[in-house]
A protein has these predicted regions:
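N-terminal secretory signal peptides and thylakoid transit peptides that target proteins
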Residues: 1-18
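General helical secondary-structure elements
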Residues: 3-4, 24, 37, 236
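Generic low-complexity, intrinsically disordered sequence content enriched
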Residues: 14-15, 23, 93-96
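Residue-level marker of structural boundaries
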Residues: 19-20, 469
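C-terminal segment of classical bacterial N-terminal signal peptides
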Residues: 20-28
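Metal-dependent phosphoester/phosphodiester hydrolase catalytic core
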Residues: 30-433, 442-443, 451-490
Length: 490
């Protein structure tokens, strides 16, 4: 793999105002009814539109390819106030930009009112250039420590202005740990966590489909399952799928076929092709019988002592006991073996799902095959696996492994594989958390998002900073670091 890395510092852009999605008002409509849209699971011929309205009403979606006429219509659905409803837009064309509007009316209204026009992109065909974006851990529950709401709106407005085909969140965006610690992890409170995040993601969600990667603080994890339908893992899994349309295996996506009682399909790991690239997400949390990272509702000190709280099993020190599991590994291996894509991008919350650093810990356990003493015990510990995860990715020339968890931007490389650690989008302390865990690489402080432009000759990665007017030490949309990755040889 050929990699070109260059530093850039472009002072450009201004702070974009937070973009709220509101229905336009008219003499025949209500005054500015709020409309919150999250697009998801786009394919070459369909897309899901998850809609929340502030009042109960009947709605349908009209759409077309010109922005002037909207000849295609969805089914008319009855929406209850503040309740997410999914519209499936079908019979679409691949590699096509679509424009759409929401038509809505309350009970007793004579005619349907019309929202403003939005747009989305169906799956690109091979040879077509495109861009996608992503950001690391949001942690809205850590306001004042590594999260600021105003700054998050700025970061999302920056993403919206770029018009990327889709956006990926890297996990720890819907933490329910505080609820579990207080004994308040019920359905209403867990769903509120997922609903509230749409206030920020609504800035991009009407035009940019959102993909989610599972993180440790979501506590959507196997170790918490206890047979009840009210345990935190089931509540988190259901809330995720209720408010964010994520992929399940079909003709376009491959992924987790497991059905969990009370949830159904987890939609936690999946893959898809888009243009010249293959995208793969991984998840160790739903496939480990023990806590991979922090135990739900337990402090850092108690975690160190392996104490249990909030249900489920305690955290283990032997990380051979946790991981992605045989089924997910076999799927991952097959997905890598069968692709002809020029680029492969893999997304996971963190190497092994826990710890700090990237290449520094990539030689350990199922990721690299060694135990803490540096002895290779892979064959005994994973007898059904061909290679450790890192070696499997190197064999198949994965372009970039993206991870979150560490709250810092770092670009590293091992064996020709780039490890890209992702920054927080809205940390107003602009810190480089866990910097000491990274012994090498290009480092940059929070906050902002990463954009990847994928073309026939290279994929260009850029880290865009987010800044408010009062953040005079930085410029909004300044490029803190950029590099290019060449296509893999297949």
């Amino acid at each position: 793999m050929q990699i070109e890395i260059t530093r850039r510092s472009l002072l450009a852009g201004v702070i974009y105002g937070a973009l709220a999605n509101f229905i336009g008002s008219s003499s025949k409509s209500y005054a500015a009814q709020e409309l919150n849209i999250i697009l998801g699971r786009p394919t070459s011929n369909s897309i899901a539109l998850n809609l929340i309205t502030s009042n109960s009403m009947s709605c349908y979606i009209e759409y077309g390819t010109t922005g002037r006429t909207f000849p295609q219509k969805s089914a008319i659905l009855q929406l209850s106030a503040a309740t997410p409803t999914v519209f499936e837009l079908k019979s679409l064309k691949p590699n096509q930009k679509y424009f759409y509007r929401v038509r809505f009316k309350a009970s007793g209204a004579a005619t349907y009112s019309i929202s403003k026009s939005y747009n989305f992109q169906t799956a690109r065909t091979p040879g077509k250039s495109f861009a996608f974006s992503l950001h690391g851990d949001t942690h809205p529950e850590r306001a004042g420590k590594m999260f600021n709401s105003e700054l998050y709106y700025v970061a999302m407005a920056n993403v919206a202005a770029q018009g990327n085909d889709f956006h990926i969140l890297m996990g720890d965006d819907f933490s329910i740990d505080p609820l579990i610690a207080k004994g308040q992890a019920n359905k209403e409170n867990v769903e509120k966590i997922y609903r509230t995040h749409r206030d920020w993601l609504g800035t991009i969600g009407a035009t940019t489909p959102v993909f989610l990667v599972n993180g440790n603080h979501e506590q959507a994890a196997q170790y918490l399952l206890d047979g009840s339908l009210t345990n935190p893992a089931v509540l988190a899994g259901n809330a995720r799928n209720k408010f964010y349309p994520q992929p399940a295996p079909d003709a376009f996506y491959t992924g987790d076929n497991l059905d969990v009682p009370g949830i159904g399909k987890l939609r936690d790991y999946y893959s898809w092709h888009w243009g010249d690239a293959l995208f793969i997400t991984l998840d160790p949390y739903w496939h480990s019988k023990y806590a991979v990272d922090n135990v739900a509702g337990v402090s850092v000190e108690d975690n160190a002592n392996n104490k249990k709280n909030g249900g489920g099993a305690s955290k283990v020190s032997d990380l051979w006991q946790v991981g992605i599991g045989d089924e997910q590994y076999a799927w991952f291996k097959k997905t890598l073996e069968t692709t002809k894509a020029k680029y492969i991008f893999v997304f996971t919350h963190h190497v092994m799902g826990t710890g700090r650093g990237a290449i520094e810990v990539s030689e350990n356990y199922e990721w690299g095959g060694k135990d803490p003493k540096g002895v290779t015990t892979f064959a005994a510990q994973r007898p059904n696996w061909e290679l450790p995860i890192h070696d499997l990715m190197v064999k198949h020339k994965v372009s970039i492994l993206f991870q979150g968890h560490d709250h810092i931007f770092v670009t590293q490389q091992r064996d020709g594989l780039i490890y890209q650690s992702m920054p927080n989008p809205a940390d107003d302390t602009f810190s480089m958390f866990n910097e000491s865990a990274y012994k090498s690489g290009v480092k940059a402080p929070n906050s902002g998002h990463v954009r990847v432009q994928v073309g026939a000759d290279e994929a260009k990665v850029e880290y865009f900073l987010a800044a408010r007017a009062k953040d005079t030490s930085r410029k909004n949309m300044q490029v803190a670091h950029s590099y290019s990755v060449k296509p893999r040889m297949v």
